[in-house]
């Protein structure tokens, strides 16, 4: 489905929260949305690797990487695996890499920046906890929508207005 965040904001002003404008769109899908699954980690993408292996149909992985600009939490192999397993998109409060390949992948990806260095895999992080960045709290089971205009969060699923 194609989402337009300004239209969703206009149709549901009482429901949406808008994330501060700090993200760039890197994925092959220019818009995406779905149920939130969260990861909180810092320069360790072990849980990202685990989650993209699972069925992600109708879901968006929201990764709170602490805003680190020193390591990439997502690369082409994990993005391709996420697309294969039906994930709608991934939002990374941190960096990604392999951006040219990710731009060709059928997956929505928004992140702060790109960085060529991968993370360590120490198995450290938290799954499905509330995470806060960009002035908004992302809660598992709520919904996130993203496009080139920005990222919004809602406590319930939203439909594009007619």
Curated annotation (Swiss-Prot):
Protein residues bound to a divalent metal cation: 98
SUPFAM superfamilies: RraA-like
Entry EC number(s): 4.1.3.17, 4.1.1.112
InterPro entries referenced in this protein's UniProt entry, alphabetically: RraA, RraA/RraA-like, RraA/RraA-like_sf
Catalytic activity: 4-hydroxy-4-methyl-2-oxoglutarate = 2 pyruvate; oxaloacetate + H(+) = pyruvate + CO2
Record: residues binding substrate: 75-78, 97
Domain of life, per lineage: Bacteria
UniProt feature coiled coil, ranges: none
UniProt-recorded Gene Ontology molecular function terms: 4-hydroxy-4-methyl-2-oxoglutarate aldolase activity; metal ion binding; oxaloacetate decarboxylase activity; ribonuclease inhibitor activity
A Pfam short name: RraA-like
Note accompanying the cofactor annotation: Divalent metal cation.
The name this protein goes by in its record: Putative 4-hydroxy-4-methyl-2-oxoglutarate aldolase
Lineage: Bacteria, Pseudomonadati, Pseudomonadota, Gammaproteobacteria, Pseudomonadales
